[in-house]
């Protein structure tokens, strides 16, 4: 049985990574695909754990070689998912989660129409502003640019199957887990997973 591909996107500062990490800790059946990026690591980020950090030239080389499942220019830096991180795992029956932006999500849905997509929204603009400022990693100019970009990203929430409002962290994680559980109970998935039982019941 082929695995399920999950897409999770959100504007910067909405708490996407924290929710994803907490959800994966509860649901070990899903593997997180580590994205490639051409941007420099932020304080505390480690290569191959948070991202695969490569130069812009290396990223362009991977694009030309057709190595990416999806890629996009995000906040002036390239981000992408390697084919090798997704296709073999799905074919082997493993569920894979992509933590990407809306541009990459649109590309993925074109290639995998049955992918399950989730968009995370902050509870308010003020909360988004406060969360981004707490990071303390960007100048005021960069912060203003990121807030403007976040508002642009939120316009695309209607392209996703599910929407989570991250007002209370534990609730948001529980809602994410519920989405994963529900997707596994879809008729098509259950029909494949329990084909023998269904045949026995209906014969």
From Swiss-Prot:
ATP binds at residues 10-17. One of its GO terms (cellular component) is cytosol. It is found in: Cytoplasm. It is an enzyme of class 2 (transferase). Keywords: ATP-binding, Cytoplasm, Kinase, Nucleotide-binding, Transferase. It comes from the Bacteria. Its EC number is 2.7.4.8. InterPro entries: GK/Ca_channel_bsu, Guanylate_kin-like_dom, Guanylate_kinase, Guanylate_kinase_CS, P-loop_NTPase. It catalyses: GMP + ATP = GDP + ADP. Residues 3-181 form the Guanylate kinase-like domain. GO terms for molecular function: ATP binding; guanylate kinase activity. Belongs to the guanylate kinase family. Essential for recycling GMP and indirectly, cGMP. This is Guanylate kinase. It comes from Xanthomonas axonopodis pv. citri (strain 306). The gene is gmk.
């Amino acid at each position: 049985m082929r695995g399920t591909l999950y897409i999770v996107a959100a504007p910067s500062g909405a708490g996407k990574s924290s929710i994803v990490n907490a959800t994966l800790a509860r649901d070990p059946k899903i593997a997180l695909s580590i994205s490639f990026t051409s941007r420099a690591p932020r304080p505390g980020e480690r290569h191959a754990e948070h991202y695969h950090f490569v130069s812009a030239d290396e990223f362009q080389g991977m694009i030309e070689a057709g190595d990416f499942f999806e890629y996009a220019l995000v906040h002036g830096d390239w981000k992408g998912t390697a084919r090798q991180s997704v296709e073999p795992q799905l074919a082997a029956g493993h569920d894979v989660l992509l933590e990407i932006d809306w541009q990459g999500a649109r590309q993925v849905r074109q290639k995998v129409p049955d992918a399950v997509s989730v968009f995370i929204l902050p509870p308010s603009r003020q909360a988004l502003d406060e969360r981004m400022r707490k990071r303390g990693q960007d100048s005021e100019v960069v912060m203003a640019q990121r807030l403007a970009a976040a508002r642009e990203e939120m316009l695309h929430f209607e392209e996703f199957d599910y929407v989570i409002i991250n007002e209370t962290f534990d609730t948001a994680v529980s809602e994410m887990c519920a989405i994963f559980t529900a997707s596994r109970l879809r008729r098509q998935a259950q029909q494949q997973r329990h084909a023998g039982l269904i045949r026995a019941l209906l014969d």
